[in-house]
Amino acid sequence: MPNLLEKTRKITSILQRSVDSLDAELPYNTMAAQLADIIDCNACIINGGGNLLGYAMKYKTNTDRVEEFFETKQFPDYYVKSASRVYDTEANLSVDNDLSIFPVETKENFQDGITTIAPIYGGGMRLGTFIIWRNDKEFSDDDLILVEIASTVVGIQLLNLQTENLEENIRKQTAVTMAINTLSYSEMKAVAAILGELDGLEGRLTASVIADRIGITRSVIVNALRKLESAGIIESRSLGMKGTYLKVINEGIFDKLKEYN
């Protein structure tokens, strides 16, 4: 059976792995599963707004309401507010505690249910909450040491990912600004007309039809599309006589066009 040191190493090794994107449906599912396996419990990670970032049900809890939290990916406001007022780990909470993840109506079924809640911090900010629970076994001191380490690791990962996402957003905004600045007035007019033709972020268009409608030459549209594609704003593919397939990669172009209109 792994000892405390081995379990600690397993948790810290999570830092060597990456989370793809906070935009993913449940970006921390894998991490929650790893932590649940190491600590031997059920686990979930929520952000400051109560949105579920990931969870793992190693042991069946058999409560419809808890499972509904996971299906909707959102915890109740009253629970999130209570959890946000936990500044240090609250360990081995009974089913009678307001912070117990076991609903009131299931107390009789899980009289020995235990919940532990740990705040997640990163960069001096409260980023979320790490919640673990068992149906019938208290968390030992060794378990609680692992919980402290786990919440720190999650905080570092969450902060790093937020930083990466921020840098990516800045890069995209810069690319859009630079692309827009290379467009002539006619090309800007063409881009606005082209994007207005799309059904959401992608679609098929015919350059000559758009050119005739807004009173510019087809070459202006072609040049505008080339500039946007070289800047990584769009992807395009010729469909021959059917026109051109267009897909917007950098959605910031829509907001930037509004500024110029």
Swiss-Prot record:
Q: Does the keyword DNA-binding apply?
A: yes
Has keyword NADP?
Answer: no
The function of this protein is: DNA-binding global transcriptional regulator which is involved in the adaptive response to starvation and acts by directly or indirectly controlling the expression of numerous genes in response to nutrient availability. During rapid exponential growth, CodY is highly active and represses genes whose products allow adaptation to nutrient depletion.
Q: What are the recorded Gene Ontology BP terms?
A: negative regulation of DNA-templated transcription
Q: Please give the name of this protein.
A: Global transcriptional regulator CodY
Keywords tagged on the record: Cytoplasm, DNA-binding, Repressor, Transcription, Transcription regulation
Q: Tell me which GO cellular component terms the UniProt record holds.
A: cytoplasm
What family, per the record? Belongs to the CodY family.
Gene3D superfamilies reported in the protein's UniProt record: 3.30.450.40, Winged helix-like DNA-binding domain superfamily/Winged helix DNA-binding domain
Q: What is the lineage of its organism?
A: Bacteria, Bacillati, Bacillota, Bacilli, Lactobacillales
- Residues the UniProt record assigns to the DNA-binding region sit at 207-226
| Pfam families, per the entry | CodY, HTH_CodY
- Family matches, as PANTHER family: GLOBAL TRANSCRIPTIONAL REGULATOR CODY, GTP-SENSING TRANSCRIPTIONAL PLEIOTROPIC REPRESSOR CODY
One annotated GO molecular function: DNA-binding transcription factor activity
**Cell compartment(s), UniProt:** Cytoplasm
Renumbered to this chain, region (GAF domain) spans: 1-159
